[in-house]
């Protein structure tokens, strides 16, 4: 007996109209729902399920030429787990939608990569260096060309640039870090950041300090760039000396903070090292919390790091969904830029001491 759309909707616990739109790749349907319906259809041997192209023809991204570019970033930065995860999310979603995808790494914004068919692109998904206004100030020729195209930035839009963006709610990241530390009884907190002008980290710092004030705890910022500063192509903070200097300043403070919020997991890994060099143990002598949930960077850390997951892969998928909705308009452009936020969630480890428990034990 032939399987009907109504049967698929019943198994997926969805309305028939939602199941139909999911099978046809409608951009208003979430990727999770779309994948659920596709899986149910495949298991029930729904006729036509083998033809993904036919099912996706209603998707505004079907057959479109979309470029995914990293701008002004060193390969060591684009290889960081959060960045790579976001790009993978974009790739997966574009492929699922039936788009033609072209990837390009553009560290030098004064050069337009050979073979990049700018005149044949329908849209661009961009990941840019978020340090100050370095990208916008470069005034590279590629920026002028990309600005002509429908644009969605992944994870964040560099200061002074154009286009829509799907970002992590970095202000909330900072606020949640402060709230968690306060709940654990910490009353003097430190924010450690070797990239003071980094847009993500500035937002996290603002959220951290604001929440600390609201909660009645004190928070101090320890932010300083390495002597050579930052330039394009931007690299991650690899100089251990800079983080060591910042951690030493935290340790020398009187009174001394009991907890550090590292601006990102890559920085937290260096904070662990800096504390170890001084003979201190994370979770006992100093508590540490961070953000991104970069498992490839933090899996080996002991004790396991408490961090805020920014859901980079989902941000990439949502960016593609937004591009599809943008292309549904006649021009693919808007009179105003739009920024969509993905909310963070806490991933609890053992790196934060519960001072309330210790106080009651005494």
Task: Describe each region flagged by the PLM.
Residues 60-179, 252-255, 266-269:
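Alpha-helical recognition/docking segments in bacterial nutrient-uptake
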Residues 15, 47, 64, 122, ...:
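Short acidic/polar active-site loop segments enriched in Thr and Asp
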Residues 73-85, 103-112, 165-176, 192-246, ...:
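Hinge/beta->alpha junction and helix N-cap segments in small-molecule ligand-binding domains
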Residues 1-57, 356:
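N-terminal helix-turn-helix DNA-binding module of bacterial transcription factors
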Residues 96-97, 212-218, 254-255, 277-282:
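Short helix-capping segments at alpha-helix termini
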Residues 188, 219-222, 281-288:
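Short acidic capping loops at alpha-helix termini that bridge into adjacent secondary structure
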């Amino acid at each position: 007996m032939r399987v009907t759309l109504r049967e698929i909707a019943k198994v997926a616990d969805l309305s028939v109209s939602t199941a139909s739109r999911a099978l046809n790749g409608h951009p208003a349907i979430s990727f999770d729902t779309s994948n659920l319906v596709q899986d149910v259809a495949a298991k029930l041997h729904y006729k036509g399920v083998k033809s993904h192209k036919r099912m996706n023809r209603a998707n505004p991204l079907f057959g479109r030429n979309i470029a995914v570019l990293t701008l002004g970033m060193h390969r060591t930065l684009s290889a960081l787990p959060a960045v790579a995860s976001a790009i993978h999310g974009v790739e997966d979603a574009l492929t699922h939608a039936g788009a033609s995808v072209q990837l390009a790494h553009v560290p030098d914004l004064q050069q337009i990569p050979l073979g990049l068919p700018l005149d044949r692109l329908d849209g661009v998904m961009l990941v840019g260096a978020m340090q100050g206004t370095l990208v916008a100030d470069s005034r590279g020729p590629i920026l002028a060309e990309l600005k002509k195209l429908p644009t969605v930035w992944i994870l964040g839009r560099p200061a002074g640039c154009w286009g829509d963006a799907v970002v992590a709610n970095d202000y909330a990241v900072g606020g949640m870090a402060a709230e968690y530390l306060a709940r654990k009884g910490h009353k003097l907190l430190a924010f450690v950041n070797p990239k003071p002008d980094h847009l993500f980290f500035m937002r996290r710092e603002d959220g951290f300090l604001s929440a600390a004030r609201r909660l009645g705890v004190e928070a101090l910022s320890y932010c300083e760039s390495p002597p050579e500063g930052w330039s394009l192509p931007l690299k991650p903070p690899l100089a251990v000396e800079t983080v060591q200097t910042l951690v030493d300043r935290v340790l020398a403070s009187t009174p001394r903070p009991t907890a550090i919020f590292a601006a990102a997991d890559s920085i937290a890994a260096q904070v662990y090292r800096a504390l170890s060099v001084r003979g201190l143990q994370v979770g006992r002598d100093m508590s540490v919390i961070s953000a991104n949930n970069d498992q490839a960077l933090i899996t080996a850390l002991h004790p396991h790091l408490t961090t805020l997951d920014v859901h980079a892969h989902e941000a990439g998928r949502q960016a593609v969904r937004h591009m599809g909705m943008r292309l549904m308009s006649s021009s693919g452009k808007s009179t105003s830029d739009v920024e969509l936020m993905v909310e963070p969630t806490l991933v609890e480890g053992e790196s934060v001491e519960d001072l309330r428990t210790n106080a009651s034990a005494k």
